[in-house]
Amino acid sequence: VKHMQSKVIYIAELYNEKQKLQIEERLMKLYGVFKVSIDIEEGAIFVDFETPANLNNLEKEVYDLGYKIIY
């Protein structure tokens, strides 16, 4: 049984709308990801997803874009 998960990934050095769109586009391409919303001021990425997507591969995608994961 697949179940939806909602997680928040906090990152460093998120400053502008261009970065926000870059991250949203990258994560939305992943199979299993339903929704991505980002709070620039908080440096928070909110993701709704189900299997086969998981928190590790979401964080890796963000890291591969050059962002440091805080927690």
Residue ranges and their predicted role:
Residues 1-3:
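Short, Lys/Arg-enriched N-terminal segments with co-localized hydrophobic residues
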Residues 9-19:
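Short, surface-exposed ligand-recognition loops at beta-strand->loop->(often short) alpha-helix junctions
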Residues 50-55:
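Helix N-cap motif at beta-to-alpha junctions
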Residues 65-71:
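Conserved short beta-strand edge segments in small beta-sheet-based binding/regulatory domains
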Residues 24-39:
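Short acidic amphipathic segments
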Residues 43-48:
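A generic structural motif
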Residues 5-7:
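Extreme N-terminal starter segment of soluble prokaryotic enzymes
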